[in-house]
């Protein structure tokens, strides 16, 4: 998966970036990209790019920039927008490549440059100060890139890069809002509570096999839902046109196209909201699943308790059957020799330590091949689902017995 390569092994980071990307789509396709209190209007559509660069790095910031650019290009493709806005659309301007660079290319470069800048200072002892400075500079960089490209590609509009060096009270207010959002996101992400949630989600007990299966099904469902949503948008556009015509309003091809354009814009906003909600539900599910998993662990030894172990044995057997291994593997029982004598002669504290060490050695030796659990008292079991031959198993067990003898001695 592309997301896994970009964000490493953290499921939590992938979910957070997915939500941030959906927020970018939402505000790029709606009025939410602007905070408007007449006569003040502040754009915040670029802020998810800066937050992505701050939290996740260069590649996620570039992807977010592309999403911003595509949203800008789509909105500029309607026939009712202002002439200056039309140059952001390859379909409305006379220079399609220039418009593509102006709308998508400049926002992609913004993500690249801001991502590289945050990556360069991430390990700095004064990162918070750099965060504030880069947040402000990112705003000016966005203005510089967009108006600089406009000055070169569309000079007839009289706008150029010098606008980036002009400051008024709106620019100062935008900088304050940007610092507040970026710094707030950074502090929230690195707070103790959120980091604990991240740890739980990343360690959740959903196996990669099950997770991949669910992801493939989810992608298939999403593709079907997206197709049906677009069909529904086209249908409602047609019905809207019919209703207006019945009222005596003449609808030409441009108006019909704009109605469909607005319907699809609405669809994108709804999809973005649903993605955010879905990812939040997944995060809550995996967090609670891991809390339940911890509750089923053996508190003394740190390995699975009896109930959880037997449940996982059944799940793993079913998985092996699905993978075509016909449930083959090894099921091993272990107990501590003369454990009652250890407790009687040395006390329960020593006995507990022996159990902890015993379970630790079992887990260390066998967890790469299967799962380990405590059945009760001094009895343990392991289910090995890797296809080991008898000789390989004997070699592993010989080394394990040698380590276990060291504990008991």
Could you tell me what each predicted segment is?
Residues 298-301, 332-335, 377:
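Conserved metal-coordinating catalytic motifs of nucleotidyl cyclase and c-di-GMP turnover enzymes
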